[in-house]
């Protein structure tokens, strides 16, 4: 497995692979890898002969400088695990490599509406940072397919729209959430939980499953269900930050005619902001 930091070398290697008739799959990450990331790699290997994984902690998508500073960097461990999975190339650029003139006054990619609603309203500028860096990585790696995790449901929708709007010839593969045995969605931020909070954290998924069942059965009015769910989260020591019920295709708010819905949730537990989602069908 190669580990490269220079975009020109990445471009050359991928070009050589493609000349030999290989398809290229790409998995962008910020490192601190876990089984959720590894599921993306395994899916990528199903779609292409060569797999590229990027490891880059992107300063543009952090609202809090302290959060950026504290984000775990585990490069040696990550590379060892990726090699065991059969990854062909790791792209690990420096900030200076991707943002040679800094990340403030630069050309950016912004997907309107989708980037400022829901999670985007809580984290202004976050998705603009995501789409800007992903578009840069797409240009450098030039993959045939790219894999993204469904845990970041809104992010996947935004990436798909960016790909359509900007005519990237890249297939976006949406990979299901990977959960611990107790139901907690795997996330790098789970490492911020204390041992006691870790025992509480699976309740987020359990409470969302209960809400999904109520919706699926057509029970109750929406405002009441959301209020009851937030109350239940608070009882479990969560601080609810976001709870939205949306059309799973458009992410528009739920209406009487909506059949396929996604419940999007974010809640603080100690220092960790946990996100999760569940899709369901209204009968």
Curated annotation (Swiss-Prot):
The keyword Ligase applies. Pathway: Cofactor biosynthesis; (R)-pantothenate biosynthesis; (R)-pantothenate from (R)-pantoate and beta-alanine: step 1/1. Pfam families: Pantoate_ligase (PF02569). One of its GO terms (cellular component) is cytosol. It catalyses: (R)-pantoate + beta-alanine + ATP = (R)-pantothenate + AMP + diphosphate + H(+). Its EC number is 6.3.2.1. One of its GO terms (biological process) is pantothenate biosynthetic process. Keywords: ATP-binding, Ligase, Nucleotide-binding, Pantothenate biosynthesis. GO terms for molecular function: ATP binding; pantoate-beta-alanine ligase activity. The keyword Nucleotidyltransferase does not apply. NCBIfam families: cyt_tran_rel, panC. HAMAP family: PanC (MF_00158). Belongs to the pantothenate synthetase family. This is Pantoate--beta-alanine ligase. It comes from Schizosaccharomyces pombe (strain 972 / ATCC 24843) (Fission yeast). The gene is pan6.
């Amino acid at each position: 497995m190669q580990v490269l930091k220079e975009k020109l070398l990445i471009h050359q290697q991928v070009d050589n692979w493609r000349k030999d008739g290989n398809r290229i799959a790409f998995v962008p990450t910020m490192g601190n890898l876990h089984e959720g990331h590894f599921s993306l790699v395994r899916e990528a290997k199903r779609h292409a002969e060569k797999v590229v994984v990027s490891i880059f902690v992107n300063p543009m998508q952090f609202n809090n400088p302290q959060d950026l500073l504290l984000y775990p960097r585990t490069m040696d461990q990550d590379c060892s695990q990726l090699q065991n999975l059969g990854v062909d190339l790791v792209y690990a650029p420096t900030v200076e490599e991707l943002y040679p003139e800094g990340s403030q006054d630069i050309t950016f990619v912004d997907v309107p509406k989708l980037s400022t609603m829901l999670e985007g309203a809580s984290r202004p500028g976050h998705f603009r940072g995501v789409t800007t860096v992903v578009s840069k990585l797409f240009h450098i790696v030039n993959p045939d397919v790219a894999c993204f995790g469904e845990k970041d449901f809104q992010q996947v929708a935004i990436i798909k729209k960016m790909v359509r709007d900007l005519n990237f010839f890249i297939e976006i593969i949406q990979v299901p959430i990977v959960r611990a045995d107790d139901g907690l969605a795997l996330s790098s931020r789970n490492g911020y939980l204390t041992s006691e909070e870790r025992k509480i954290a699976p309740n987020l998924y359990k409470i969302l499953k209960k809400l999904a069942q109520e919706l699926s059965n057509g029970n109750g009015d929406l405002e009441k269900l959301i209020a009851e769910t937030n109350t239940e989260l608070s009882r479990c020591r969560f601080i609810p930050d976001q709870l939205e019920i949306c059309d799973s295709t458009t992410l528009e708010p739920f209406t009487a005619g909506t059949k396929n819905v996604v419940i999007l949730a974010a809640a603080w537990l100690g220092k960790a902001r946990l996100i999760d989602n569940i899709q369901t069908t209204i009968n």
